[in-house]
Amino acid sequence: MRRRPPSRGGRGAARARETRRQPRHRSGRRMAEAISCTLNCSCQSFKPGKINHRQCDQCKHGWVAHALSKLRIPPMYPTSQVEIVQSNVVFDISSLMLYGTQAIPVRLKILLDRLFSVLKQDEVLQILHALDWTLQDYIRGYVLQDASGKVLDHWSIMTSEEEVATLQQFLRFGETKSIVELMAIQEKEEQSIIIPPSTANVDIRAFIESCSHRSSSLPTPVDKGNPSSIHPFENLISNMTFMLPFQFFNPLPPALIGSLPEQYMLEQGHDQSQDPKQEVHGPFPDSSFLTSSSTPFQVEKDQCLNCPDAITKKEDSTHLSDSSSYNIVTKFERTQLSPEAKVKPERNSLGTKKGRVFCTACEKTFYDKGTLKIHYNAVHLKIKHKCTIEGCNMVFSSLRSRNRHSANPNPRLHMPMNRNNRDKDLRNSLNLASSENYKCPGFTVTSPDCRPPPSYPGSGEDSKGQPAFPNIGQNGVLFPNLKTVQPVLPFYRSPATPAEVANTPGILPSLPLLSSSIPEQLISNEMPFDALPKKKSRKSSMPIKIEKEAVEIANEKRHNLSSDEDMPLQVVSEDEQEACSPQSHRVSEEQHVQSGGLGKPFPEGERPCHRESVIESSGAISQTPEQATHNSERETEQTPALIMVPREVEDGGHEHYFTPGMEPQVPFSDYMELQQRLLAGGLFSALSNRGMAFPCLEDSKELEHVGQHALARQIEENRFQCDICKKTFKNACSVKIHHKNMHVKEMHTCTVEGCNATFPSRRSRDRHSSNLNLHQKALSQEALESSEDHFRAAYLLKDVAKEAYQDVAFTQQASQTSVIFKGTSRMGSLVYPITQVHSASLESYNSGPLSEGTILDLSTTSSMKSESSSHSSWDSDGVSEEGTVLMEDSDGNCEGSSLVPGEDEYPICVLMEKADQSLASLPSGLPITCHLCQKTYSNKGTFRAHYKTVHLRQLHKCKVPGCNTMFSSVRSRNRHSQNPNLHKSLASSPSHLQ
């Protein structure tokens, strides 16, 4: 037979392994080891019957009566302590209703679905397969075919008494506790219908019409003191009243509390002179509800709610008779309550005062239980949302609170010692329960005449019929605080494929692969394997809400394509860190290490930067070779400019230089225009407009893909593209759903190299990354290392200029890109070059060294006074209202530099018109990245407004004559100006480009 995946540890796993090794008719023998009967009989081991596997051959008791010896009985007094759902516990409870049966009661299936929704899918499949159920049959609710492939026309199902006993097990879990209690309340509140005694030849139509007529009219008040006027169903000890929470409880919590006649509650105020006799509790008291487990199909007791003369059939365990006699309960024996029922008489008096009931949550009283039920459901019964972090059991009243808590990466918030008091009490109670050696209290269920069988005296009463537990009756029902209801989650969600879902046990080869009743989630779900199961709440599954949010997200993305929370697009970039995030840069270096000669063109599939691989550091996104090839092909079409960026070999820190034979042969006029475009619009703009190629880096044919058609196609493809994994979707709604399912829990690492801080949102990460005060140490180290790294993007243009034209100083290009420059300030702050050009360099570029004294200190990012009315053409896309830009002194000294018109002795000039023309040639939708704050803007106008309002007025020039150092704050400028040691180098000769 086929092998199934090994189940996980625990008692349930051991049972599953045993059932895999044996056929169905022998699986029960393995499970029966050390499973003794809980009734007072000598049976020590369950032995399944040959015909009915749920009946023991030795004692004729049912499977549930034996299996309950291995299950913990929850206490019946009000408590908010619940257990954590575990796979082995769910297996034990599932065996009560699934082992040896072919159909599941509806109420139990609803509750079991809740528990399965907490487990992983493979755990659910293991439980079902171990009990010889398939997922299709479980979803359907009954087995369609037997082991031989025959279509069933009758099914074996657990009896109603066994169902009640199983329902009690669901009180142990917060996911199902409230549902079980509400089921009990609903059943107990069924309106009684007074029907005259039926005759043998009564007409069915007349009977139904009579019932309808009587139920439609207002019934006369029922005399609660007359036992004959009470609905017979309420008199059955086997109903669900045991699951109602009671305030008065026995120190020894009973396992099954029956519904007592209401006159008991009315008489509990009277003095009873008789002393109760000592109660006798066995390991599991006798009960007749477990004696009918051999019935092949038990009629649900709910079918008899409107038929008082038809009570659930009971069969004797000693002989499987076919008796069809039904008993009508018309009389009760008056018995006295135990002393425990007299606890807190002031609370008890509320139940007798005009029939008023009170709510235990807010202590308010109500006219009747119906009003109390409406109040409790509307005020106190709220569906709680559990934290999605595995191992954290915090629950919240709203999705917003839950999501905010789950998105917090602080592990202390999700550790057990910081959970709420309810969970602390739960752990304490579990530890206490495991340490105590207590015996399972029994279920108290009597025969239809409300008297226990002679051979099995019920533990609920002593020999005189006195109740062994307190009961405050119908009017005194108390409601606990139901705080642990979890939203229903589909336990059959993918990661399993439809073939795996349809995988059936070896003994059921004839079942269909997939039934039509299985939801589409089994087929269309695209969620990957994840250690943390994705949980969606009931609210988020509403189509209207999703559609509304999708429209809002789509509109927001159209108007704010590059908001603070978006990843900057690396098309117009200033350095390699801009072209590729630090994470992707490191990944690409590890995956694409060059082993060939220096200056070798990058082979296909080994581009120095893949936008597809720009991922967050915490996201474990890996690419298969096929995906990598596909991504590299897409990069050839979409980002041809990025292939121009060379990268150094990882090992040894050696540098690549262009060989003499591979120097670019570019006409000087074209070179000058290319340089201007590099200064004004970036590398991508220059190449896309000129179509020039550097033979040392890539063949010129690669650049033929760059054009308006390619740009339009790129923009169209990127319209609905995920900013993190770069996958393209058909619409904005698909992008939103993909981002929520795939990336909502990813952490975002700081983009500053050397800083490993992580944040739950891109907006927080960008705010942190733009604060240079937090990165002075990392930036100082990076600035020192940059002098040895010639192939950082900061020095790419300078090196290209030196190799192409040794006699032309590429001063402006090297400085206008505003990248990390050699040198730091006294405080170790990051410095940027500021350029000036003599009036003679308006039309041509004069050769001259770069002044190391001309630096810009951006050590702080606080707001500045408006001392500057100019900015570089590269920074502002070549447009400035004042017509001034930051230039560099052509003769190398530090005199006469100013950002304010009129202060400089040299005319202010730059390639304003040409830069503006180059920017005008850019596509309108092409994003632009600000080189100072790393924010991305959707178009030139937005970026221009940002630069004017944020960065243009933040530059403060040193007050010392001849020092052109610029600062982003007055405080830093004053501190620099007052330090005479920093201005001794004004007389030193400037250094030349190396």
UniProtKB/Swiss-Prot annotation:
<feature type="region of interest" description="Disordered">
    <location>
        <begin position="859"/>
        <end position="881"/>
    </location>
</feature>
<dbReference type="GO" id="GO:0005730">
    <property type="term" value="C:nucleolus"/>
</dbReference>
<keyword id="KW-0221">Differentiation</keyword>
<dbReference type="InterPro" id="IPR013087">
    <property type="entry name" value="Znf_C2H2_type"/>
</dbReference>
<dbReference type="GO" id="GO:0008284">
    <property type="term" value="P:positive regulation of cell population proliferation"/>
</dbReference>
<feature type="zinc finger region" description="C2H2-type 4">
    <location>
        <begin position="748"/>
        <end position="775"/>
    </location>
</feature>
<dbReference type="GO" id="GO:0006356">
    <property type="term" value="P:regulation of transcription by RNA polymerase I"/>
</dbReference>
<dbReference type="GO" id="GO:0001216">
    <property type="term" value="F:DNA-binding transcription activator activity"/>
</dbReference>
<feature type="compositionally biased region" description="Basic and acidic residues">
    <location>
        <begin position="603"/>
        <end position="614"/>
    </location>
</feature>
<dbReference type="GO" id="GO:0000182">
    <property type="term" value="F:rDNA binding"/>
</dbReference>
<feature type="zinc finger region" description="C2H2-type 5">
    <location>
        <begin position="928"/>
        <end position="951"/>
    </location>
</feature>
<dbReference type="InterPro" id="IPR040436">
    <property type="entry name" value="Disconnected-like"/>
</dbReference>
<dbReference type="InterPro" id="IPR036236">
    <property type="entry name" value="Znf_C2H2_sf"/>
</dbReference>
<dbReference type="Pfam" id="PF12874">
    <property type="entry name" value="zf-met"/>
</dbReference>
<keyword id="KW-0805">Transcription regulation</keyword>
<keyword id="KW-0862">Zinc</keyword>
<dbReference type="GO" id="GO:0008270">
    <property type="term" value="F:zinc ion binding"/>
</dbReference>
<dbReference type="GO" id="GO:0005737">
    <property type="term" value="C:cytoplasm"/>
</dbReference>
<dbReference type="Pfam" id="PF00096">
    <property type="entry name" value="zf-C2H2"/>
</dbReference>
<keyword id="KW-0677">Repeat</keyword>
<feature type="compositionally biased region" description="Polar residues">
    <location>
        <begin position="615"/>
        <end position="630"/>
    </location>
</feature>
<dbReference type="GO" id="GO:0030154">
    <property type="term" value="P:cell differentiation"/>
</dbReference>
<feature type="zinc finger region" description="C2H2-type 6">
    <location>
        <begin position="956"/>
        <end position="983"/>
    </location>
</feature>
<dbReference type="GO" id="GO:0005634">
    <property type="term" value="C:nucleus"/>
</dbReference>
<keyword id="KW-0479">Metal-binding</keyword>
<dbReference type="GO" id="GO:0045943">
    <property type="term" value="P:positive regulation of transcription by RNA polymerase I"/>
</dbReference>
<keyword id="KW-0597">Phosphoprotein</keyword>
<dbReference type="GO" id="GO:1900195">
    <property type="term" value="P:positive regulation of oocyte maturation"/>
</dbReference>
<keyword id="KW-0804">Transcription</keyword>
<dbReference type="GO" id="GO:0007283">
    <property type="term" value="P:spermatogenesis"/>
</dbReference>
<feature type="region of interest" description="Disordered">
    <location>
        <begin position="402"/>
        <end position="425"/>
    </location>
</feature>
<keyword id="KW-0744">Spermatogenesis</keyword>
<comment type="function">
    <text>Transcriptional activator. It is likely involved in the regulation of keratinocytes terminal differentiation in squamous epithelia and hair follicles. Required for the maintenance of spermatogenesis. It is involved in the positive regulation of oocyte maturation, probably acting through the control of BMP15 levels and regulation of AKT signaling cascade. May also play a role in the early development of embryos.</text>
</comment>
<dbReference type="GO" id="GO:0005654">
    <property type="term" value="C:nucleoplasm"/>
</dbReference>
<keyword id="KW-0238">DNA-binding</keyword>
<comment type="subunit">
    <text>Interacts with HSF2BP (via C-terminus).</text>
</comment>
<feature type="modified residue" description="Phosphoserine">
    <location>
        <position position="537"/>
    </location>
</feature>
<keyword id="KW-0863">Zinc-finger</keyword>
<feature type="region of interest" description="Disordered">
    <location>
        <begin position="555"/>
        <end position="639"/>
    </location>
</feature>
<keyword id="KW-0225">Disease variant</keyword>
<feature type="zinc finger region" description="C2H2-type 1">
    <location>
        <begin position="357"/>
        <end position="380"/>
    </location>
</feature>
<protein>
    <recommendedName>
        <fullName>Zinc finger protein basonuclin-1</fullName>
    </recommendedName>
</protein>
